[in-house]
Amino acid sequence: MIIGAAGRDFHNFNVHFRGNQAYHVVAFTAAQIPNIAGRRYPTALAGPGYPDGIPIEPEADLERLIQGLHADVAVFSYSDVSHEHVMHLASRALSAGADFLLLGPRHTMLKARVPVIAVCAARTGSGKSQTTRRVAALLEERGIHPVVVRHPMPYGDIAQQAVQRFAVLSDLDHHHVTIEEREEYEPLLRAGRVVYAGVDYERILREAEREADVLLWDGGNNDMPFFVPDLLITVVDPHRADHAAHYHPGETVVRMADAIIINKVDTASPAEIATARRVVGELNPHATVIEAASPIFVEGGAVLRHKRVLVVEDGPTVTHGGMPYGAGWVAAKRYEAAEIVDPRSHAVGSIRDTYAAYPGTGPVLPAMGYGEEQVRELAETIRRTPADLVVIGTPVDLGKLVKLDKPSVRVRYELEELGEPSLTDVLGRFLETSALAEASTQGTQAQASVES
């Protein structure tokens, strides 16, 4: 049995269990993501050993499933959870009679034919996305064409989403993606990047590497990369510095990292930054440690002054990511909003359920939109919240997906390198020693020629 959340679990099955005569997978379980339990992993992806596919059941039924399906092994396969959470699940599996297993990189990472740079994080919401965008821009400046491969988010038709390629914004509509997927893909597409994602990452890898000088793995949650990285960059949030040593598999990617970015130093206290340095130094004393900021940009931000505002934040960050707020809340404070209106008492349906499931979420609205009904409930929650204005802290253009009955402003944020060593330095050293050195030199010379 594979204990999952519609991502890592499917990958682990595809690369380690599919076609493996030593195992027969009797079920997946689902957590974190709504509307996954009750479905089936399709035969088209499961292979000939599974003519009826594989059922996906609620994690809450773990003990009953292990005993009823006579599962010998429970394989933990999702991310962004505390070490304690993992061991509670282990105890549940063991008490039901099953072994408990974690699969490591040797069994789950695929080898690419082109260099791979992976961006991962200690926790969801640390700043992977803007780091990925910055790395892609630095590569492009050097004449190196990156193709981004994103950690899976197969929340629709699993078989149809086996291999997805996004090159223009209209591809998002073509693939019927959720708000959560748009949050990741839209900023990359606006920057001119090609993005691959889906379910079957062996097929995705072979497609993506055909059009890339380098593959740029854009991690999800705090998970390990699915491809063997030639350079692993892990982002740490100093607001949750101690989490780097207490969350799975974030601690793993901190320990594995070649470079560690301590992000958000512009909003963290000196004590928080010092704690982050101490923690990552203890876990990985050999990594290059970089400091970076996440400056916030709000077009027309002055309109927030003295207004009562509703803040909509990136959903994963303020739910299983454990942050009470995000960039939208910071922007509302910075631009002197009169009040950040608490939406929790106005929430309806699954949005209300989300607050119950994640009581650590602060007085902000997670941009949950895993299906049409949830998007409607999100819109209704916004309508019911008595505010003058909506502050959109999620990266997606929410106004195009949800009918807003209030004026809105969007918050944007990018990675800003601070001091030495820098991400530019780390990337430059990597390129000098990789097969990309010649292309990098030609690209740098061309850039210098343009600037002169």
Predicted regions mapped to residue ranges:
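Flexible phosphate-sensing "switch/lid" loops adjacent to ATP/NTP-binding sites
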Residues: 67-69, 117-118, 130, 137-381, ...
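P-loop (Walker A) phosphate-binding loop of NTP-binding proteins
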Residues: 122-123
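Intrinsically disordered, low-complexity terminal tails and inter-domain linkers enriched
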Residues: 436-449
